[in-house]
Amino acid sequence: MRIKFSVARHARKKKVLKRASGYYGDKSRRLRMATQQVDKSLVHAYTGRKDKKHQYRQLWITRINAAVREEGLNYSNFINGLAKSNITLNRKMLSEMAIQDPLSFKKLVDVAKQAIAK
């Protein structure tokens, strides 16, 4: 009798079980459970990559807000003042500037305050 797909099937099983090799219990040993868990893990990895972008933006905004409040302003007024001043720095750069170069960041806050006062 001819054996169909034996090499391909074995390779496919081996690939799934290799990916599942740190999972708890039967999820790392039984093919059906391992396949289900690997699929679920790939879904979580995909959504995690998307969610990471939102989390970083939230972190940057929190850092900017904390630094701006030390200067007597809040985040939304600061961003509004920068927009009125035609200063286009993204939130990542503003966050880094607030941490690494507080003097330059203070100058930006002063520019934003002047733009709001007008």
Curated annotation (Swiss-Prot):
Q: What SUPFAM superfamilies is this protein classified in?
A: Ribosomal protein L20 (SSF74731)
* A single GO cellular-component term on record: ribonucleoprotein complex
Query: Which InterPro entries did the record assign?
Result: Ribosomal_bL20, RIBOSOMAL_L20_CS, Ribosomal_protein_bL20_C
- Disulfide topology: none
Which Gene3D superfamilies does UniProt cross-reference here?
6.10.160.10, Ribosomal protein L20
Family per UniProt? Belongs to the bacterial ribosomal protein bL20 family.
User: What name goes with this protein?
Assistant: Large ribosomal subunit protein bL20
Q: Mind listing the GO molecular function terms for this protein?
A: rRNA binding; structural constituent of ribosome
| Pfam families tied to this protein | Ribosomal_L20 (PF00453)
Please describe what this protein does.
Binds directly to 23S ribosomal RNA and is necessary for the in vitro assembly process of the 50S ribosomal subunit. It is not involved in the protein synthesizing functions of that subunit.
